[in-house]
Every structure is written in C-alpha cells, then in structure tokens.
Amino acid sequence: MYIENINGPEDVKKLSEDQLNVLAEEIRDALLKKLSKHGGHFGPNFGMVEATIAMHYVFESPKDKIVYDVSHQSYPHKMLTGRKDAFLYEEHYDDVSGYSNPGESEHDHFTIGHTSTSISLALGLAKARDLKEENGNVIAVIGDGSLSGGEALEGLDYAAELGGNLIIVVNDNDMSIAENHGGLYENLKALRETNGESKCNLFKAMGLDYIYVKEGNKVADLIEAFKQVKDTKKAVVVHINTQKGKGYKLAEEHKEEWHYCAPFDVETGNPLDSFDGEDFSSVTAQYLLKKMKEDKKVVAITSATPTVMGFIEDKRKEAGKQFIDVGIAEETAMAMAAGIAAGGGKPVYGVYSTFVQRTYDQITQDLCIDSNAATIVTFWGSVYGMNDVTHLGLQDIPMMSNIPNLVYLAPTTKEEYLAMLDWSIDQDQYPVAIKLPGGEMISDGKKITKDFSQLNKYEVTEKGSKVAVIGLGTFYNMGCEVAKAVEEKTGTKATVINPYYITGIDEVLLEDLKKDHDVVITLEDGFLEGGFGEKIARFYGDSDMKVFNYGVKKELLDRYDIEELLKKNHLTVQQIVGDLKL
C-alpha cells in the first residue's frame, strides 16, 4: 500500500500519476473503514480526495499554507501530512480531531469548525507573508455551501485588492449539507454548464482571475490546474467540479444523508445503532407542519441545517413556501426572522447553539431593540451536545440571557417545549428563544397550563424547607435527584423549583424562600460565568442565604468525556450533597 509509506507531502511527490490514482483508492478504503466504525464527515472527504492529493503534489506544505473552510473535509489532508495512522489503525482513531488542528501538525494553521472563514484567514496569512517580504503560496479551500456565508463574500470582495499571491479553491459539488440555496449557486451552475465560460462570472466580477476544472476528481487535471496558478502574483479562483461522496454508491446517491455519518454497516449503509423514537427535531417539524396548516403566517427558517428542526426532504416539500433555507447565513436568517415578525409573520428559526454566536449582533440589534416577536429554538446547547472545541454548545446561556427584551426559556420535557413554542408563536410582544434540553427527550404526558406571558414566574414542584434546588432545563431532573438525596441524608424534604425562564428571576419566590430556607442550589447546563446561577446568587448577595452554583467552568473544551466533565465540575448528585456539608 502506498498510503503506508506516506509520512508527509514529500512522499506524495515521489509517486507517478498511476500511483497517485491508486493512492486515492487507498485513502477512500481507509476512510470507509474508519467512518463505518467511528463516524464522522463522510461526503465532504470522499469528494476531496483527488484535490487534496493534487495540492500536496504541487505545493510545498507547510511553507505553502492550505486553509480548509470548516475543515470537515480535511481527513485526506491529515492522512498525507503525517497522521495516516489515525485513519489506518483502529487503536489510533481518536489520535486526531475531525477538524484542522495546529496542535496536531505544522500543516494545519488554524483550529476551524465554523463556515465561511477560510478566505479571510488566508487573506491574513498572505498579508503577513507580504509584510515579512517572504515567498509562498496561500490556498483557501472552500465549498459545501460555505460561499453563501457573508464572511466568504466579504473575503472575496477584498481578495482582488490584496495585490499578492492568493489561491482560492472553490470545491463545487452542488451541495451544502442539503441542497444549496441562493442566486450565487445559480451562477456556479451556469459556470459548470459552460465549462467555466459563462459571461456571468461572480469571481471575475470581483476582479479575480479564474480557471475551471471540469473533472475535479481527476488527479492529472487538478495537478495541471494547480501548477498553472502556483506562485501567481495575484488572487485567483480555481473552480473545481467534484462529486460529493465519490467512491461509495450510497453517498453518491443520497448526498444529504451522507454528509455526516454515525457508525454503519458498509454493505447496507444502515447505522449500527438505530433510533426509531421521537426527539426534539422530529417533534419540532411535526408541530410546525401542523401549525403551518392552521396559520399561513407561520414560517420555519434554517441556515443550511434543516434536519436539526426535523425538516428532512419530504417535510420541506410539505411545508412549501412556509419553509426557508437561506444557506449558511445565520445573520441573514436572524435578520429575516426579525423582518418577517415586524411585517406580521410568525417566524421560527431553528439553530444549533454553537452557531448562535454567528448572529449575535442581529439578535441584539434587529430582533430585540424593537422587540420583534420571532422565535429562536436552540438545539444541542448542552454538555450532551457536540464536544469538539469548535462546536461547543455551552455559551448560549451567558450570551442570550443578558440581551435586553429577549425572553429565554428552558423546558425540561417535550410537553413544556411544545407549550412554550405554541405560546411564543401566538404572542406578539416579545422576541423569544427556547433552549432545548440535552440528552434524550423526556415526555411525561402532563398537560401544561402555565401562562408564559407572566414573565419570570418560577414553579415550585416539590415544597420543602431548609434546602431549595433550582434545576434549569436539562439539569432539572438532576435537581430532583439532589433533593431526594438531601432528604435521605437529613430527613428534611428539600424544595425543588423549575424556573422555566433563563433571562429573569422570580424575586417574589426567591424572597419567600428566605423564610424557611438556608441554602439554595442552582444547576445549569452551560458556562457558569455570566449564567443563570449568578443571577440567583446576586439576588441573595446581601442576605444570609448560602448559594451554591453548579454548571461548567468557562474553558475551551475539546472532545471531552461527559462523565469526566460532570465530575470535574462537581455535577454529580453525590458531589453536590457532599459540598453542602449537611
């Protein structure tokens, strides 16, 4: 096997064209084996094998710097830059992350996981090179829908003005995670259909040189193209037409489903661990489709992640014009939601917690200043969510709970969530966000009669004395377990409180606790600093009430073990009760 002898790009350069083609097959075989056992980004990597080989054949990494947008397609790059063992041998599968990582290799220049940043980052590297009067190529690799992100367009806009070497490889597989959206992709389609000759050319209009590679999965053609632009003295776009998922039939035929995969059976493609029950995604789509039929003003919005809201392809078709995918453009999604609300519509924007930060300004400026009554549903904002450092969902409580006018809610069950969502859509006074719990969805069948328009009214679910436990969202059930453990240890029944609201405190209830409680415990699923518990502690700051805040310490975690993280932050029932020293 050639791949076993590849310890760096210098070894790639030793191979003939035929050998490079065999190397591509070996890379795909290794990827198929690893991803079937380990999971990861499938389609993006299978489509970029030949381009990655060609880049490392032509350029001189790490002197020539390659920046992968999102970097979810960087697996072949890692295999060719000294990290092949992490893809060839199961005992080493966890040696590398799923994204570029400077801590792993000098061939990686940034830790990247969010979209549309590569061109701007590459511009910075190119400018630094020129300031130091050095030589070398800087290559930005962007695709999978990332061009629709505002930062990518901003980077393209400035690239022609840079005045030095910059190579932008546009990996055009006609897909985002799902299908692409927006006029930009119509232009890419026109360029594909005319072999790059269309008179309407976005890149040339921005002052960039341009070449087109029709066979973006053909090593020889890619090598020729990259040799043509190597050491260019200006900014140039190399537009390559690739096939997402190339080399695995199921991924070629079902590109959306195979963007990312869990462990699966290679022969059938079926996941090894199937889940047939409800989750918050499927429940969201089911509810919204029903609501859409009842009210034509209801509209669901996504920024290129439709399945997080449960809107798989058939449900998107069912929703029709009442479903909007703006592409990878969170800022536009949020501002558009604010505009729809201002115009009398009822928008619901579903977004991963980790991507909320990409639209923070729009939430503050466009949504909340005028109190436009849009609904935001944040998914996977939890220690039980994604655990890569680039995709943590632990910051949304401090970020969103401190924006004036925003009502941020934290349900603990399916029933509470749907009641909150229904109230939020039908009311027209407040911008509302709903933080979905992490872990498995709990459904207790209870009918929710709470009036959420009475803001910041907590609910005492178990009345006791001495110790009060306020469990927010995901950690409400842990709060119930803590209360039970307190009673078992002391014989005194503890009070349990479901706060519902993240953005405000129930001063009446908290004041009442002073009468017969000495200790208040808060539990929250996210960073402690600037979070929910600190608001409670601040309220009791001038009193004798002892307050224990539990959550996650603010730090950039990467690929953490959930149980270890909980123990590290004293987020276990035994540790919490022990801290009380009862």
State what each model feature region is:
Residues M1-M79, K204, E215:
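N-terminal amphipathic, basic-rich helices that act as targeting or association modules
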Residues D29-S36, D95-T111, E133-I139, I312-I324, ...:
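Glycine/charged-rich beta-loop-alpha catalytic/anionic-binding loops adjacent to active sites
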Residues G40-M48, Y68-H72, S100-I119, I142-S146, ...:
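Active-site nucleophile and cofactor-binding loops and adjacent substrate-binding regions
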Residues H41-L162, V298, S303, I312-E313:
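Cofactor-binding active-site loop characterized by glycine-rich and histidine/acidic residues
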Residues K65, Y248-Q357, Q362-N372, S465, ...:
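Non-catalytic terminal/interface segments that mediate subunit docking, oligomerization
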Residues Q73, D108-F264, T268-G277, S282-Q286, ...:
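Glycine-rich ThDP/TPP pyrophosphate-binding loop and its adjacent helix/strand module
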Residues A86-V96, E161-M175, C368-W380:
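A glycine-rich helix N-cap at a beta->alpha junction
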Residues P271-S274, G385-N387, V407, F527, ...:
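Peripheral docking tails and interdomain loops at the edges
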